A protein has these predicted regions:
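Metal-dependent catalytic core segments for phosphate chemistry
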Residues: 1-3, 13
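PLD/PLD-like phosphodiesterase catalytic module centered on the HKD motif
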Residues: 5-10, 18-177
Length: 177
């Protein structure tokens, strides 16, 4: 049983805050950096409600500078400045504002062509990573991974309800092509 009082701190597949979630996320980012350094296509896609954790943001900036393409779909608080030369040129941030607040968190790591998907409850905020019980699980079913690909691709292609974050921290409506 996973609760705030649980003694178990290691899990086989489950990434759990405050125990393993932060460290594993940072390992996954570092792995994408290694793939980029080896000349492989490297990409991270994150769909979440908030990203404000300093260590996570610094890791994503390092990844961007190493050649990793990063697409973020962030519903709420976002402390990343995308598109800043020499800092975050490969990071794109969009927000999709619809009728309903979305609660799904989806992570995707290209992993040298063997894409990995994760779903869970955690936003990338220090309170979620360090002071709450949150869980993220790898998606091991191929069909479920394909469905997540479809969902994220649709969200990244949305031109009706999406806004893009610019380097000057302003949001602009995505232009309909």
């Amino acid at each position: 049983v996973l609760t705030g009082l649980s003694r178990q701190q290691t899990f086989r597949r489950l990434l759990v805050a405050p125990h393993s979630l932060r460290s594993r996320f940072l390992e996954l980012v570092d792995r994408e950096i290694a793939h980029a350094a080896a000349g492989h296509h490297a990409r991270i896609v994150l769909k979440l409600n908030a990203i404000v954790d300093v260590a996570v943001i610094e890791a994503l900036y390092r990844a961007s500078n190493a050649g990793v393409d990063i697409d973020l779909i962030v519903r709420g608080a976002c402390s990343i400045q995308p598109g800043v030369p020499g800092v975050s040129e490969r990071i794109r941030v969009r927000s999709i504002i619809g009728e309903f607040l979305e609660h799904s968190r989806i992570w995707s790591f290209e992993n040298g062509g063997s894409r990995e998907w994760y779903i869970g409850s955690a936003d990338l905020m220090d309170r979620n990573l360090d002071r709450r019980v949150e869980a993220v699980v790898p998606v091991e079913d191929h069909d479920a991974g394909e469905r997540l690909t479809e969902i994220v691709d649709l969200m990244l292609a949305d031109e009706r309800r999406s806004w893009q974050l610019r380097p000057d921290a302003t949001w602009v409506r995505t232009e309909v092509v």
